[in-house]
Amino acid sequence: MIPTNDAHITLMNYDDPLEWAQSVTRELENILLQEITQRGRASLLLSGGTTPALVYETLATRPLDWSKIDIGLVDERWLSPQDKDSNAWLVRHTLLEHAKHATFLPLIRPGKTLNQCVHDANLQITHSPPPCAVVLGMGNDGHTASLFPGSLDLQKAINTPQPYVALDATGCPGAGVWPLRITLTPAGLNNIPHRLLLLRGKQKLKVLETALSCKDALDYPIRTAIDLPNARLRVHWCA
């Protein structure tokens, strides 16, 4: 089991998915409210996948001043933002379906190349106040964002000073049929003070336990989020 006094993470356990989603929502709501109070505006980065959808739907019901909140993405598949397999589509049809006044900043821009989209993403995040919070996920292979074990670009993505990079995960099972990606890097994550990792199921907990004992980010890229200084990774796990 994961030790409760681990120096890198704080683990919260839930048996009920609704309780899990409501707890994560309360945490995000408080972070966003504090940021708006202090700075006048807040920015939040979200991940795709099936795990966070319930959280996004719950967060969308909260009475926040969404006109003062920017929503960005942790990573994206090289797809049209209108494609149902894109992370942009997921966020639009869960969170933004109700939080209509939020400003959405997708990573893929129609008519631009992958490298141009990466350039624009880096300009956006570099010349704006840093996001106050990020919602991460993790695959059964230990990947987070689009940092896949076995990717030829992984070491470069881990070492780059750029917040976002393009990554080719050809041959990586976790990437499925969408090997080309834009992904947040450890450098980009390092500037975000509140880092939440959302997990569902016993298999994901076992993967996290293995990653904590492994220590090698090339084998378990989730370690890039675990090992960053300045803030613990807050893990919300539901059985």
From Swiss-Prot:
Keywords assigned: Hydrolase
Domain of life where this protein originates: Bacteria
Keyword Signal on entry: no
UniProt-listed Gene3D superfamilies: 3.40.50.1360
UniProt entry tagged with the keyword Hydrolase: yes
CDD domains named among the record's database cross-references: 6PGL
InterPro entries named in the record: 6-phosphogluconolactonase_DevB (IPR005900), Glc/Gal-6P_isomerase (IPR006148), NagB/RpiA_transferase-like (IPR037171), PGLS (IPR039104)
Pathway per the UniProt entry: Carbohydrate degradation; pentose phosphate pathway; D-ribulose 5-phosphate from D-glucose 6-phosphate (oxidative stage): step 2/3
Pfam families registered for this protein in UniProt: Glucosamine_iso (PF01182)
Gene Ontology BP, a term: pentose-phosphate shunt
Molecular-function annotations in GO: 6-phosphogluconolactonase activity
EC nos: 3.1.1.31
Reaction(s) the record says it catalyses: 6-phospho-D-glucono-1,5-lactone + H2O = 6-phospho-D-gluconate + H(+)
SUPFAM superfamilies assigned: NagB/RpiA/CoA transferase-like
Function recorded in the entry: Hydrolysis of 6-phosphogluconolactone to 6-phosphogluconate.
Similarity section: Belongs to the glucosamine/galactosamine-6-phosphate isomerase family. 6-phosphogluconolactonase subfamily.
Protein's UniProt name: 6-phosphogluconolactonase
Protein species of origin: Xylella fastidiosa (strain Temecula1 / ATCC 700964)
Higher taxonomy: Bacteria, Pseudomonadati, Pseudomonadota, Gammaproteobacteria, Lysobacterales
